[in-house]
């Protein structure tokens, strides 16, 4: 009994795709670092809390920072947002109640007790905001700071800025302008990734 030609072609394509997928880094990747936190509302959001997860594929480089600085100098907040949109994802932010979104910029800085992680990405604009052309659409960044204490995990803290934009203050310094108040991050759990990568 002979096998029809189209079945041979399908079988060969299947084998080739399987081999190609096995060699892709996405299928044979190292373990990512994951940081879970509980975000507590402050000010007008007092009493509310949500879960926040930051998955770190890799950290951004000083060259990435320079690209963002130049983009801000040329186009202010809109320039920064456009530059973030063009950058590849270095992580993923998940906030309870959302599907989550790719994170374009994550930097790590050593501290006396551990590490400081700063992240920023474009905020997803909701359908209601777009429909009503809300003022909140100009706050198109989500950012955060995580202060990880490796000596005493209970002292790890941070801040989440769910809707923000960068502006220059009266002294010409960059500052974060928020739509509402920052959220306080606590109960941070750091699930270390593959050593040396993230």
Spans of model-derived segments:
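Long, low-hydrophobicity ectodomains and other hydrophilic envelope-associated domains
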Residues: 30-198
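Sec/Tat signal peptide C-region and signal peptidase I cleavage site
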Residues: 24-28
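N-terminal secretory signal peptides that target proteins for export/translocation
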Residues: 1-7
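Bacterial N-terminal signal peptides
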Residues: 10-22
């Amino acid at each position: 009994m002979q096998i029809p030609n189209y079945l041979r072609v399908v079988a060969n394509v299947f084998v080739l795709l399987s081999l190609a997928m096995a060699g892709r880094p996405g299928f044979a990747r190292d373990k990512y670092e994951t940081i879970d936190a509980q975000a507590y509302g402050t000010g007008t959001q007092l009493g509310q809390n949500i879960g926040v997860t930051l998955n770190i594929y890799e950290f951004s480089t000083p060259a990435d920072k320079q690209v963002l600085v130049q983009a801000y100098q040329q186009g202010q907040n809109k320039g920064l947002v456009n530059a973030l949109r063009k950058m590849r994802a270095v992580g993923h932010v998940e906030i309870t109640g959302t599907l989550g979104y790719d994170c374009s910029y994550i930097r790590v800085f050593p501290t006396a007790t551990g590490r400081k992680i700063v992240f920023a990405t474009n905020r997803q604009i909701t359908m209601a905001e777009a429909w009503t052309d809300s003022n909140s659409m100009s706050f198109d960044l989500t950012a955060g700071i995580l202060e990880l204490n490796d000596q005493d995990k209970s002292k790890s803290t941070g801040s989440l800025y769910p809707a923000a934009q960068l502006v220059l203050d009266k002294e010409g310094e960059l500052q974060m302008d928020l739509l509402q108040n920052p959220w306080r991050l606590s109960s941070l759990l750091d699930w270390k990734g593959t050593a040396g990568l993230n």
